[in-house]
Swiss-Prot record:
<dbReference type="InterPro" id="IPR029057">
    <property type="entry name" value="PRTase-like"/>
</dbReference>
<feature type="binding site">
    <location>
        <position position="27"/>
    </location>
    <ligand>
        <name>xanthine</name>
    </ligand>
</feature>
<dbReference type="GO" id="GO:0000310">
    <property type="term" value="F:xanthine phosphoribosyltransferase activity"/>
</dbReference>
<comment type="subunit">
    <text>Homodimer.</text>
</comment>
<comment type="pathway">
    <text>Purine metabolism; XMP biosynthesis via salvage pathway; XMP from xanthine: step 1/1.</text>
</comment>
<keyword id="KW-0660">Purine salvage</keyword>
<feature type="binding site">
    <location>
        <position position="157"/>
    </location>
    <ligand>
        <name>xanthine</name>
    </ligand>
</feature>
<dbReference type="GO" id="GO:0046110">
    <property type="term" value="P:xanthine metabolic process"/>
</dbReference>
<comment type="similarity">
    <text>Belongs to the purine/pyrimidine phosphoribosyltransferase family. Xpt subfamily.</text>
</comment>
<dbReference type="InterPro" id="IPR000836">
    <property type="entry name" value="PRibTrfase_dom"/>
</dbReference>
<feature type="binding site">
    <location>
        <position position="20"/>
    </location>
    <ligand>
        <name>xanthine</name>
    </ligand>
</feature>
<dbReference type="InterPro" id="IPR050118">
    <property type="entry name" value="Pur/Pyrimidine_PRTase"/>
</dbReference>
<dbReference type="GO" id="GO:0005737">
    <property type="term" value="C:cytoplasm"/>
</dbReference>
<dbReference type="GO" id="GO:0006166">
    <property type="term" value="P:purine ribonucleoside salvage"/>
</dbReference>
<keyword id="KW-0963">Cytoplasm</keyword>
<dbReference type="Pfam" id="PF00156">
    <property type="entry name" value="Pribosyltran"/>
</dbReference>
<keyword id="KW-0808">Transferase</keyword>
């Protein structure tokens, strides 16, 4: 998506440790108009799929997923929680994922009443690096017997291999911007097309 690539080039910052900071428009301050166009792009890509639910992970995927849901007939959005809470009651699906950004493992939890065997799920997230967070969401869907129809990603770090691995497993991954390389010393960002 050219508009997203341009925003990354003009407003993104490359940090040491393969970190791309895009908090001006994606994951701290949210550009809702951009999110709307992202949702439209995913709706076009996944037009042949029967999406009944969108699943993301807290926190940065929530805004993108909610806006995107409007392009899929306002299907429900479920977000996996990263910690047990008194608000989470009843039976749950739980798995553990490793966060590249936070450099630690954490549980991800979804109440069983919100993820079902009849669901056809679109996974959405802001970033895809090594694919661990998405693997956790896939595990939750498998535990529920739900079908993963596709994966929508705002920014994929192509050089970290997570997207390529998921595609090799047969998942339909639609990343709107794929960063091929980035240099923290020069700030240069190269995209895969």
């Amino acid at each position: 998506m050219q508009e997203l690539e341009e925003r990354i080039q003009s407003e993104g910052t490359v940090k040491a440790g393969n970190v791309l900071k895009v908090d001006a428009f994606l994951n701290h301050q949210c550009d809702v108009r951009l999110f709307d166009r992202m949702g439209s792009a995913w709706a076009a890509h996944f037009a042949g799929k029967h999406i009944t639910k969108i699943l993301t992970i807290e926190a940065s995927g929530i805004g993108i997923a909610c806006v995107a849901a409007q392009h899929f007939g306002n299907v429900p959005v479920v977000f996996a929680k990263k910690a047990q809470s008194i608000n989470l009651d009843g039976d749950q699906y739980t798995t553990t994922v490793y966060s590249f950004t936070k450099q630690k493992e954490f549980p991800v939890i979804v109440a069983k009443k919100y993820l079902n065997a009849g669901d056809h799920v679109l996974l959405i997230d802001d970033f895809l690096a090594n694919g661990k967070a998405l693997r956790g969401l896939i595990d939750l869907c498998e535990a529920a017997g739900a079908t993963v129809e596709g994966i929508g990603i705002a920014v994929e770090k192509g050089f970290q291999g997570g997207g390529d691995a998921l595609r090799a497993e047969g998942y339909d991954v639609d990343s709107l911007a794929i960063v091929e390389s980035m240099n923290p010393e020069t700030g240069e960002i190269t995209f895969r097309h």
